[in-house]
Structures are given as C-alpha cells and as structure tokens.
Amino acid sequence: MSATLIDGKAFAARVRAQVAEHVTRLKADHGITPGLAVVLVGQDPASQVYVRSKGKQTTEVGMKSVEHKLDADTSETDLLAVVDQLNKDPDIHGILVQLPLPGHLDEDLVINSIAPEKDVDGFHISNVGLLGTGQKSMVPCTPLGCLMMLRDYHGSLLGMDAVVVGRSNIVGKPMAQLLLGDSCTVTIAHSRTKDLADVVRRADIVVAAVGRPEMVPGDWIKPGATVIDVGINRLDAPEKGEGKTRLVGDVDFDSCAAVAGAITPVPGGVGPMTIACLLANTVTACCRANGLEEPEGLTA
C-alpha cells in the first residue's frame, strides 16, 4: 500500500473533542445544554445498536440525550405526535428519526414533519433545497464528514475534479453539492453511467457511495487521487469460520490503495464521522436557535 490512510476514527475523535469543548462553553457562558432526541420505531437490531451508540456519544460530549422507543406497530398519527412534541420542546435542538421505518409508515412524511432547524440529519426537503442553492442549512452527516476529511487532507479543494459514484438523496446528491460549494468540478456518476471507469479515472477526488461491494477497482483510479469510500457492505468470510462475515467498502481497498494518494478504510474511515457530525450538527442547531456564533469548522 502506497496511499496515505485517512483515519476516520482519529478524525472523529477530534471532532467530538471540538464539540465537547463548545458544549462546555455553552453551559458556562450561557447556561445552555444542547439536546438531541432520537426516535426509534420497532426492534431492528442494527438500528438499536446505532441508537445506543448515538446516545452514548451524545452524553460523553456533555449534551442532553433523549430516546423515544416506540413499538413496531405504532401508528403514523402517534409517531407524528411524538415528533410534534419534540419540535415544541425548547430543550431539544436536534431531532433524529432512525431509519428505516416499518413499512406502514411514510418516511418522507415523517422526516418532513421535523422542524427544519432541528433536522440534524439534514433530510428535510427545506434543508435539501437550502443546500442545493448554497444557503445555510443543516447538512447531512455522512457527506459533511467526507467534506471535513477532504478539507483536512487537502486544505483547499479549489478547482479539483471530483467524481461522486452514487446518486442517493442521503449521500450522493448532497456530497456533490458540498463539493461544488468548495469550488470543485463535480461529476455525479452511478452504476449505469456509460464508460464509468473512464469517468472515474479523470478524478482527483473519488467519493464511492454506490452500495455495491468492491465495485471500484484500482485500475479505475487516477494515480495520486484521493479516494473516500462511503460503502459499508457485509460479505461472507468462511476463512474466519462458519457464519462469519467481513466488512468491505464500495472500492477494492488493496488495489485502490496501491494507486491512490490517500484513501479511507472500511471499517474505520467514513463511518465514525457520521455520528461525530450528528453531534456537530446538534451544537450548530443549538447555537442558531439561541442566536449565538456557530462553532468554527463543524459545518460546511
């Protein structure tokens, strides 16, 4: 491997330390404690693990953590009532409804019922529109984490060619908007892009967020390019024992690392940044709600 490893765990720890420092100042100078509420519907094991991790990290940085755990058969009316209650609570500055929701619930309706200024996931249609027009918004956590790591590694992204492989509303599209905002020349590609390999080879920055394990091989990467791997895919790993699995990204790590200038690993790359940026967004939302200066370096 010749590429520099971009350590997401270490970077996320730095972000959490910045958040904790700002929370301490908010308490000492203004008597304000940022509050994050997470709503979980049902018993999805992966969601439960994720919500526990969010709650733990929220309290570790000194913020108020609130969890609402609802039964899987909770009605849409009852779920919307919980969100409405949180919208009106002045001690709650960030609201997150854990996805996916059970099939009988309308995810778009629920997400858009969250007050935009408390939408720390950045999924509300108002925040999507604000981001797309270059205005102040709540920025989706995973793309924000990617941008933070790119800025840290490169300094300025001015004039760089960037390819985002993936067009999801959660990662691909907002990632492209953020890169445009930093004056990159941006191409959004996807699994059906013609001559995808040639498109990717032109990029100084490749962000892979297509949801296909090890789809991007090393011979697609321009020598010296920076590769940000957003993918999290679980593959069978019989070499580890019966029923064992391993996590891989959307790029073939070994072949890409031999060519790239810098690369994020999976696990330990983008993943840890997602919750760190959720905490950062909550502090940002708290400052905006109280007319205070936003913490520097914690948003786009």
Swiss-Prot record:
Pfam families: THF_DHG_CYH, THF_DHG_CYH_C. Its EC number is 1.5.1.5, 3.5.4.9. NADP(+) binds at G166, R167, S168, S191, I232. It catalyses: (6R)-5,10-methylene-5,6,7,8-tetrahydrofolate + NADP(+) = (6R)-5,10-methenyltetrahydrofolate + NADPH; (6R)-5,10-methenyltetrahydrofolate + H2O = (6R)-10-formyltetrahydrofolate + H(+). InterPro entries: Aminoacid_DH-like_N_sf, NAD(P)-bd_dom_sf, THF_DH/CycHdrlase, THF_DH/CycHdrlase_cat_dom, THF_DH/CycHdrlase_CS, THF_DH/CycHdrlase_NAD-bd_dom. Keywords: Amino-acid biosynthesis, Histidine biosynthesis, Hydrolase, Methionine biosynthesis, Multifunctional enzyme, NADP, One-carbon metabolism, Oxidoreductase, Purine biosynthesis. One of its GO terms (cellular component) is cytosol. Pathway: One-carbon metabolism; tetrahydrofolate interconversion. The keyword Membrane does not apply. One of its GO terms (biological process) is methionine biosynthetic process. The keyword Glycosyltransferase does not apply. One of its GO terms (molecular function) is methylenetetrahydrofolate dehydrogenase (NADP+) activity. Catalyzes the oxidation of 5,10-methylenetetrahydrofolate to 5,10-methenyltetrahydrofolate and then the hydrolysis of 5,10-methenyltetrahydrofolate to 10-formyltetrahydrofolate. Belongs to the tetrahydrofolate dehydrogenase/cyclohydrolase family. Homodimer. This is Bifunctional protein FolD 1. It comes from Roseobacter denitrificans (strain ATCC 33942 / OCh 114). The gene is folD1.
